[in-house]
Amino acid sequence: MASLCQRQQHCVKASIASEWQLAEAQDQLCGLELHSSESVEQERARALASSTELSHTEHQWRLKERMLGTLCPEANRDVFDKSIINITQSWPNESDPDKSLNFVQRNEELLKHFGMLGRWDDSQRFLAEYHHLICEETANYLILWCFRLQAEKKEALMEQVAHQAVVMQFILEMARNTQQDPRGCFRHFFQKAKAGQEGYLDVFHTELQAFKDRVKEYTMKSTGETPKDTVHQNTPPACCLDPKEVFESLPQELKTCIQMQDMQILQNVLSSMNPQVAEYHVKRCLEAGLWTNIPRTSKDESSEVDEWKMMET
């Protein structure tokens, strides 16, 4: 059972590796057009062969991934219930479990903060400051966090964390391909991403969407849901989160604001926080109905949401 879960994660990583190497091969093909040496045709043939081989490798991994669900569907459900969603401290066996657990315990707040970042510059600065986070343990934590968030019906937050999980996987894969320490080459990844280099962003967004689709698909399988079931769940109740649970999860300064119901103090606190973190807490407070000093009529409710959003920017 555990090996099936490991094979699924291996499929995710191998798919990213194949896409990245394919983009590198295509980049080489484009570069050859700028040179005019006697060996151009030979180099072009080798690069084209490499591109074809990588495309075939990616196709094979896609087939293996689909077979995981058809060969043993009931086992898949057991594996994801036990190994990904329900047990918060169950980590992949690619590294020493004790080492992974200790790493998470020491750095969980930083890992969560990185998972909430949305801009390339913010992620690069954060990793430059906390370069010890550039490792497999971080990638594993973010991947498993995505499955847990989707299981908790927190799809928007899952998609945010998925972006950062794929960022970390691409950095690690670039390091493996170039045989460098990932802490020494992560800036190169962000340079390519921010420059919008042709091919690389397409690969990134393709893999990101594929990963999010896999998370949703396997979560539906593990809970026995069907796509039709999820349509009815897209209309949440007026208060879809437990107010007590949300309140306990807030930073102390936000708890004070909620208790005082003072909009000016709240605005000052939010302006001093990381924008992504502030947005996360604001959405949860609204969904839990913790902000009550503005009457919630149908007209006022939309203006209240707009006021919260204005404070985030």
UniProtKB/Swiss-Prot annotation:
GO terms for cellular component: cytoplasm. GO terms for biological process: protein folding; protein stabilization. Signal peptide: none annotated. Gene3D superfamilies: 6.10.140.250, Cdc37, Hsp90 binding domain. The keyword DNA-binding does not apply. It is found in: Cytoplasm. InterPro entries: Cdc37, Cdc37_C, Cdc37_Hsp90-bd, Cdc37_Hsp90-bd_sf. Pfam families: CDC37_C, CDC37_M. It comes from the Eukaryota. Co-chaperone that binds to numerous proteins and promotes their interaction with Hsp70 and Hsp90. PANTHER family: CDC37-RELATED (PTHR12800), HSP90 CO-CHAPERONE CDC37-LIKE 1 (PTHR12800:SF2). This is Hsp90 co-chaperone Cdc37-like 1. It comes from Danio rerio.
